[in-house]
């Protein structure tokens, strides 16, 4: 309500652009998803072990796995304080841990190293500009491999193909 521009991190597309256009997406903002209860139940609901970050990616992937699509409705407004989450070290730790968990819980095993590897590369490139949080990030990355992330429910190869055809292979 303050008139401040939407942070691009809340636009769930690789090519962010303007927030207004609606499109198929592969993650949802955890604060305001809207879907039929039957689809939510078929998708397995929220990924409770995450605690912070990536539950929305998992829910979106699993909705795609039910044969449905996930739509970002750019014309809807959800108000939330635009506070930089990187102000806390747990942001880095949980993002890294949960990326690994997301892959371990949902992807066919052969894709897990590609997904985690691509996000590791992205984080290393980001750290060239700003090393803040890199230690916490690697701590979370290691925890993701060491800890059990809860139940595994692999998405089907046909879902990987549908997501790829829709513009977002589950590798990035």
Where are these regions (language model features)?
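Acidic donor-binding loop at a coil-to-helix junction in glycosyltransferase catalytic cores
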Residues: 52-58
